[in-house]
Amino acid sequence: MAFESLTERLQGVFKNLRGKRKLSEKDVQEVTKEIRLALLEADVALPVVKEFIKRVRKRAVGHEVIDTLDPSQQIIKIVNEELTAVLGSETAEIEKSSKIPTIIMMVGLQGAGKTTFAGKLANKLVKEENARPLMIAADIYRPAAIDQLKTLGQQINVPVFDMGTEHSAVEIVSQGLAQAKENRNDYVLIDTAGRLQIDEKLMTELRDIKALANPNEILLVVDSMIGQEAANVAREFNQQLEVTGVILTKIDGDTRGGAALSVRQITGKPIKFTGTGEKITDIETFHPDRMSSRILGMGDLLTLIEKASQDYDEQKSAELAEKMRENSFDFNDFIEQLDQVQNMGSMEDILKMIPGMANNPALANVKVDEGEIARKRAIVSSMTPEERENPDLLTPSRRRRIASGSGNTFVNVNKFIKDFNQAKKMMQGVMSGDMNKVMKQMGINPNNMPKNMDSSALEGMMGQGGMPDMSELSGTNMDVSQMFGGGLKGKVGEFAMKQSMKKMAKRMKKAKKRKK
């Protein structure tokens, strides 16, 4: 994920400040020097770095830091605020037309991800606004781009207008807009041609399309993996076309992230969306304050909550909770839950959105094996509908058939079913509030719990029967996390369990005091 090295460097800088009661001007100079080096290593453009450091230093050498009793927190606060300002301060929405359709023109270099982004944005508009977009394939130089856009359109059930490669891009856009008005589409997304580098022919064509379409938005799609060159590309396109916003693609890649910090400052135009993966749903509205928080390792709970809420169905959740309580959770429910977890993104990225988890050493032990998840899916897919609904039907002969059909060994199938049954029992205990049962399932003897810990009161920690934090179940005899292809292992898992027990003991003390 982008920014990982920058986050690590900045956290190291802030760590060195801890314990200091006050900072001298010399200390501030040293801190800002380290921040400057960290930004340059992250491929942030030099002019942006200079301006950023100048602003941080100006605030830090004043009364804001030198006279404060907690300089490390104050420095972090200043850096966070200035970083947010560099990224744009406020979230920028799509500029909509007062009359339909709203026309959005995608521009950028070849390979930046314009076509893919057009599909992602169209899907987002359909899902969130119940919109009726039309996509126009205006890249006449790459037949593959037209085919790709049509494939994406079929995937998300959005119409694509194309006239092949025999007509000019301007003619195609003209005909496409006429069709959009006739069909009363509320959005038109124009996928334009790109080049491996900026040239006058490309710009002339784009200017002609702009003059014809009069778009509400001209979104520059930038590949975040090209580093400092992103700033030059953004500057040139903005000078020629006056873009209205920027899209950063491939931000999930192993990049240094400097593009995000450079583009906004150099063009003066807001970053509106980021591409966070290969799936059609891997698109996020860009929030400067949240991105700043992520870069500084402070997490991003709001985005995490939004991701979790996208496919949330209150009725289904209530039904699932009841099935857990009644111990009738089946393999169909398991696959449904697996889909929901995977739709949120990789487990590593989800954990990094939790405050304090970015670059946490424990994350090095969290490994989600996609192959393992695929094997579990294959096992369930090889079951009959009756077997999925009633796991008790799985006799040894049926398990051998499932192993053969799914390409797994008999041992692996047995282990999967055993883990599933143990997880069911544990979930039933959690939902019913029987914590003694839960601890036994986890391999913990309730009699060995700390004396100041009343297990009957543990259900108060669960939010009145809610599910516990599954990360606190790691390092136990029953590794429920393995059901989803990964988890904390070894000494780290054991340490996490002990820390969890200590936290629960403290919370029990507080709960008892409140009752008194």
Curated annotation (Swiss-Prot):
The gene is ffh. Disruption phenotype: Doubling time increases for growth under nonstress conditions, unable to initiate growth at pH 5.0 and under 3.5% NaCl salt stress. Double deletions of Ffh and FtsY, Ffh and scRNA, or Ffh and YidC2 are barely able to grow in the absence of stress. Pfam families: SRP54, SRP54_N, SRP_SPB. It catalyses: GTP + H2O = GDP + phosphate + H(+). Composed of three domains: the N-terminal N domain, which is responsible for interactions with the ribosome, the central G domain, which binds GTP, and the C-terminal M domain, which binds the RNA and the signal sequence of the RNC. Belongs to the GTP-binding SRP family. SRP54 subfamily. Its EC number is 3.6.5.4. It is an enzyme of class 3 (hydrolase). This is Signal recognition particle protein. GTP binds at residues 108-115, 191-195, 249-252. Keywords: Cytoplasm, GTP-binding, Hydrolase, Nucleotide-binding, Ribonucleoprotein, RNA-binding, Signal recognition particle. It is found in: Cytoplasm. The keyword Cytoplasm applies. Involved in targeting and insertion of nascent membrane proteins into the cytoplasmic membrane. Binds to the hydrophobic signal sequence of the ribosome-nascent chain (RNC) as it emerges from the ribosomes. The SRP-RNC complex is then targeted to the cytoplasmic membrane where it interacts with the SRP receptor FtsY. GO terms for cellular component: signal recognition particle. The lineage of its organism: Bacteria, Bacillati, Bacillota, Bacilli, Lactobacillales. Part of the signal recognition particle protein translocation system, which is composed of SRP and FtsY. GO terms for molecular function: 7S RNA binding; ATP hydrolysis activity; GTP binding; GTPase activity. PANTHER family: SIGNAL RECOGNITION PARTICLE 54K PROTEIN SRP54, SIGNAL RECOGNITION PARTICLE SUBUNIT SRP54. Its main location: cytoplasm. Residues 383-405 are annotated as: Disordered. It comes from Streptococcus mutans serotype c (strain ATCC 700610 / UA159). One of its GO terms (biological process) is SRP-dependent cotranslational protein targeting to membrane.
